[in-house]
UniProtKB/Swiss-Prot annotation:
Binding site for UMP: G53, D73, T134, G135, N136, P137, F138, F139, T140, T141
GO CC annotations on file: cytosol
Entry keyword set: ATP-binding, Cytoplasm, Kinase, Nucleotide-binding, Pyrimidine biosynthesis, Transferase
Provenance organism: Burkholderia cenocepacia (strain HI2424)
Biological process annotations from GO: 'de novo' CTP biosynthetic process; UDP biosynthetic process
Protein's name according to its UniProt entry: Uridylate kinase
Kinase is among the record's keywords: yes
Length: 237
């Protein structure tokens, strides 16, 4: 079976790295994620990753608690840097060559984000992990995923979550909630479905960049998507 995609952008939330823990990085969880990523890399699909920081610090929560929102967002960006380094290290142990590029400069630790370099590294078979979101406060890492996916020419944004797609309501709170197989960007925005923020949806819509929402906890889901199988929910123009 041939690959459905040549280049994809995977969005991982920081919360997904916690596993069953209340905080931080669960090593077993990150190793399982890397095993799924390794399968895709072996198929020959070029993979970029945008990673969140909510397992360490959430800028929105810091702002709500009385901290200056911009300061809180910068702290959240630093949290994504820690997650990116942890993910890169786990990939190295699994034999995957990966590079971290950051929207905030920290030259002794990671490369700065340079678009042509990122594209070249993808073409050479490396996984590129984008850290520090967009580098600007008030923008989520979901928006960073939409932005970087557009910049590097990804064919789809793969949004890994704890649920297996986009639902009409929160399935944990509403047992009658139904999962969409496909849904348009305009419909997702108008219904205020809280899977990605409206800015990310709007950017992907304008760039005609589809989003597939799937469960990170479902073994083999990432590989099945890359092979073109129906998994999760496709958000499209």
């Amino acid at each position: 079976m041939s690959n459905a995609y040549k280049r994809v952008l995977l969005k991982l939330s920081g919360e997904a790295l916690m596993g069953d823990d209340a905080f931080g990085i669960n090593r077993a969880t990150i190793e399982r994620m890397v095993a799924d990523i390794a399968e895709v890399v072996r198929l020959g699909t070029q993979l970029a990753v945008v990673i969140g920081g909510g397992n360490i610090f959430r800028g929105v929560a810091g702002g709500a608690a009385g901290m200056d929102r911009a300061t809180a967002d910068y702290m959240g960006m630093l949290a994504t840097m820690m997650n990116a380094l942890a993910l890169q290290d786990a990939m190295r142990h699994a034999g995957i060559e990966a590079r971290v590029q950051s929207a905030l400069r920290m030259d002794q630790v990671v490369e700065p984000y340079i678009r042509p370099r990122a594209i070249r590294q993808l073409e050479e078979g490396r996984v590129v992990i984008f850290a520090a979101g967009t580098g600007n406060p008030f923008f989520t890492t979901d928006t960073a995923a939409a932005l970087r996916g557009s910049e590097v020419g990804a064919e789809v944004v793969l949004k890994a979550t704890k649920v297996d797609g986009v639902y009409s309501a929160d399935p944990k709170k509403d047992p009658s909630a139904t999962r969409y197989t496909t849904i348009s960007f305009d419909e997702a925005i108008s219904r205020n479905l809280q899977v990605m923020d409206a800015t990310a949806f709007a950017l992907c819509r304008d760039q005609k960049l589809p989003i597939r929402v799937f469960s990170i906890n479902k073994p083999g889901a990432l590989k099945r998507i890359v092979l073109g199988e129906d998994e999760g929910t496709l958000v499209h123009v």
